[in-house]
């Protein structure tokens, strides 16, 4: 382990990756040694784009190039830790080799959040090929995992909506305050950046209205249920905001 932790971010050009890069760049114990984007960022004979070219606010803060992601290039950076801000299937494919090479992996996708591999086809659209890692992954909320995070090799960072629900609901369930025979009802509102940085008409600001989506079938519901121990009825809403989440939670008290 190096004196300053050598950090690689895969998925740096996305909103989450850029926020992470900015935070780590100012951390005294971290050194950013590699930024990677899609594996489609193949060389064209020109210099790779800098992250600050994609996010001008990071000029002078994170001026590293963003290169095409592949396992060999990532490991060539000699990282102590790798953050995967990548799609679920990409994280599931990359993590095993990185772990085998001795890197600590922080996965920001949902690829290792659920302990039951059979839930992935229904909620995330792919068969999980590394089910054994699901029992090894440590859920990345300190309020849930506690000291287990100190020695974890694979950290499954929590989802956005689940974080807003688990933090208030889990302690109430554990204390016996909530009636577990009744569902906990969650109405959440999220800003548009939660949909990612890819161009899409539905994400254009003038196209955004207050609207529910994923009603009774949102992929974050099983994660909430797993980590709270409660039955969850969850309805998310898209609102015309840049960022942020507001969750209004209704629960019946135990008799």
Task: Go through the PLM ranges and name each one.
Residues 194-255:
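Charged docking surfaces used in two-component/phosphorelay signaling
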Residues 1-213:
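N-terminal Rossmann-like NAD(P) cofactor-binding subdomain of oxidoreductases
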